[in-house]
Amino acid sequence: MKTTKELLNFWEDQMKLSHTSSNYFFRKSPSHYHMMLLVMNAYKCNENLTVEELKTKLFKTSRPKSALMINEACEKGFFILEKTSNDQRKKFIKPTGSFMKEFEDYLKKLREISI
């Protein structure tokens, strides 16, 4: 029962955060949350994820909608796009430093609840 109450408190605290925060943005839809997990997984595994690969991996999301979501995440400062030296058309998507910290804090709180 304690864990359930802690989880409820955690969720309520997350929802109280500013609507401009990543918490709000990545919970807009399952596709937004999926995008966050794909980018962070690639980053944690030291893999390069291109914008095109991300668009393909986002299930049940059209390519135009995926592009809008990616652009919005970049505009809000959660992700950055890096061009490759080999092919200027190919762009890798990476989390920003500030978003990486938010994500780590989020995971830390989740771990504390589950222990």
For the regions a language model picked out, list residue spans one by one.
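Short amphipathic alpha-helical interaction segments
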Residues: 60-75
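A short, conserved structural fragment
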Residues: 74-84
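Amphipathic alpha-helical dimerization/coiled-coil segments
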Residues: 18, 104-115
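General nucleic-acid-binding
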Residues: 1-6
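Short helix-to-turn junction characteristic of helix-turn-helix DNA-binding domains
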Residues: 39-43
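Short, cationic-aromatic polyanion-contact patches
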Residues: 84-107
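Short acidic, hydrophobic short linear motifs in intrinsically disordered regions
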Residues: 45-57
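Short alpha-helical segments that sit at the start of domains
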Residues: 7-38
